[in-house]
Amino acid sequence: MADTTVDKLATEVGKSTDRLVEQFSQAGIKKSANDTVSESEKQQLLDFLKKQHGGDAAPTKMTLQRKSVSTLSVAGSGGQSKDVKVEVRKKRTFVKRDEAAEAELAAAAKAEEAKAAEVAKTAAEAKAKLDAEAKAKAKADAEAKAKAKVLTEKPVQESAEDKAAKAEEAKLLAAQDAAAKSKADEDVAAAAEVARRLAEENEKRWAEEEKARKEAEKTVDHHVTTSTEARAAEDTADANAEKRGRRPRKPSANAGNNANANAGAGKPGGKGKRGKDNRRDSRNSRNSRNNRSVAPESMDHAFTKPAAVVKADVSIGETVSVSELASKMSIKATEIIKQMMKMGSMVTINQVLDQETAQLVAEEMGHKVVLTRENELEHQVLADRNGDVLAESRAPVVTIMGHVDHGKTSLLDYIRRAKVASGEAGGITQHIGAYHVETENGMITFLDTPGHAAFTAMRARGAKATDIVILVVAADDGVMPQTIEAIQHAKAGGVPLIVAVNKMDKPEADPDRVKSELSQHGVMSEDWGGNNMFVNVSAKTGAGIDELLEGILLEAEVLELKAIKEGMAAGVVVESKLDKGRGPVATVLVQEGTLKQGDIVLCGLEYGKVRAMRDENGKAITEAGPSIPVEILGLSGVPSAGDEATVVRDERKAREVALYRQGKFRDVKLARQQKSKLENMFANMTEGEVEELNIVLKADVQGSLEAICDSLNALSTAEVKVNIIARGVGGLTETDATLAAASNAIMVGFNVRADAQARKVVESESVDLRYYSIIYQLIDEVRDAMSGLLAPEFKQEIIGLAEVRDVFKSPKIGAIAGCMVTEGTIKRSAPIRVLRDNIVIYEGELESLRRFKDDVSDVRNGMECGIGVKNYNDVRVGDQIEVFETVEIARTL
């Protein structure tokens, strides 16, 4: 390396030139800024700086100190606790190995190595000398043999004495050679043994010195020494405090234990325990001077590990999530998930379980289950009602259904005009939707056409507000689509049906035709051996009206309709609305008890105090009995048609129940089973059962309706069945939407549309509504939905075939097959098979696909490519690589 100047060296080390010149001067070297500096001068300056800054005196010992302060709560006199600050100081010293000792060990090792090398050298020299003597002897023997050969050729005859002398000489030479060789071998063996013993002694001595050094380092533990000395000082201080006490301490019952503890202090492992027991006893003795009732406290914890699984009583409500159930059972949620997987159910930690499933899981894991109801307050409020009150006969509630052109309204007008007091004027009060009439044989309550929709809603919620259905059919028109719809609603509600054949005054009336058409829909006349009563009436002349009313009362008598007349009322909401001037208005049909003004009413999600009551004529009333429709004001909101209205005692509890229902309303909707939509029909399939696809069908004309129904019914198989629960001609109405929501059905409109009220129900109830204008499209989509219930089939299709022409080795991938695509296309993402003599020897996937050193996604027929098979290197020339893909084939009907 070339010499550098002082100025350049100052720039390299980051110092000023004057400072560096001064340091050179202090080191005894006279330099200026432009003088050159040699390597020896640099080393001399560095040694001087090290000595000046203490570089030679490297630290041989390092001490670390740590201090921590904590607070300990200790019971004091008088049962009060006091806080004691505890300061813990830790000190640890690390000692560096002595460099002199290391140098001495290194020198000794070097000397031993030199000695062993000298011995080995001596042995090698002896062996070399022996080899030289052997070579010289061999040379002499060769010369002697040559000389003897020359002598033998001479014709002179040797004497017997010469031969004997030569033989003796040869014998002596052989003995000398053997002795010299054995001596050399002994010297070599002795030298090797000496070297081996020296090496073993050195290794043993070095191991002992290293072990002694490590033990010395372990003993120099100032932390242990400090803590031991601190405990000894504390014990001494406690003993001195006891000696300075006013009264001597009386011998206690545990004196023997203390003596044993002190006696065992000298044993190994008893040092720390002795100090701890002494300190605890001294604290107890100090406390005994202040308060004799203080018992010696134990610093050991009282927790014992349970020997078996803890069996607890698990309280389970109507619904509980997996995480909540795990918390109640004091286990991890994964244990519940494992248990449910064993039971055949795949759940997540946040999935909500119903009460029965949660009970089964908890009992399976060995816990006792206590079932609770979150709506206990609701049950208490509804149970706090009438006592043992005898039920009395009540008037029947009759709903009149039928086609709007079949004289239903005229029949209602005639019944009301004939049976209501003559002083009362006006027609039917349409806004209330219900009224009652008095006959000679009893009272009858009628629900008019708006009650039709309310009836469907009530059936959807499980209420039975209607007792009897009157089906009005025009004698000259026969059965119409809305008539069939009314029959379906009556059958779905499970109520008896009375047929009123109207317009008998017309000359073209044909009641037998009506009976024949109704019999095709399951409504059979009593004259034909059926169970349905047929009455011929005329709303224009009044013929047959009395027979109809008598038939209604007779059917009611057969049904034995009874209700409690006295006490707290209960009923059902027929219809409701929001009036601008009066607020929420609900029409309630009282089913039992007596509803009075001022009662607290709990109605579905709403509640309130009855501020006013009106009858069907709009007159204010103060009470209403069973089977009486009444209009009430004062609710907190508009209830839904079909909600149960119940009178309760406490308004505060009614408000709590209403708020609870409102909170649970969303949960109930989310927990409800998924509806039978076309997209998730397969998810709703249950094994071993015949699936049904419920459909509410509406079409524009009767011919299209019949054709669609026949085609859909023909699609039914042993596994999937089409169930058309309602059909008709005309637009989709609110009644159809409510029926579809109640039956988990699909609404299908063929060249028709839904009105505003129906769309509102569809949106609120999440009903699947579909429109079609081509009959084949409708049938195909329903067939696809039914096919979705069948398990799909999977088929493997070969998309490409490549022949291996050559095999190359790659350090990264392994064996690379140089192939020619003979059929189809080779794709990188598709699985492959390796064929040898048309036998599959490997099935896997491609690791690389290249063409001209470029990665490609596919290679077509007739092209060459390089293929790397993943995790397989036994590719040979002549093999075939087959590329295939799995295709899912949906089953069709």
Curated annotation (Swiss-Prot):
It comes from Shewanella halifaxensis (strain HAW-EB4). CDD domains: IF2_eIF5B, IF2_mtIF2_II, mtIF2_IVc. Residues 448-451 are annotated as: G3. This is Translation initiation factor IF-2. Residues 201-224 have a biased composition (Basic and acidic residues). The keyword S-adenosyl-L-methionine does not apply. One of the essential components for the initiation of protein synthesis. Protects formylmethionyl-tRNA from spontaneous hydrolysis and promotes its binding to the 30S ribosomal subunits. Also involved in the hydrolysis of GTP during the formation of the 70S ribosomal complex. The keyword GTP-binding applies. InterPro entries: DNA-bd_dom_put_sf, EF-G-like_DII, EFTu-like_2, IF2_assoc_dom_bac, IF2_II, IF2_N, P-loop_NTPase, Small_GTP-bd. Keywords: Cytoplasm, GTP-binding, Initiation factor, Nucleotide-binding, Protein biosynthesis. Residues 251-265 have a biased composition (Low complexity). Residues 502-505 are annotated as: G4. One of its GO terms (cellular component) is cytosol. Residues 427-431 are annotated as: G2. Residues 538-540 are annotated as: G5.
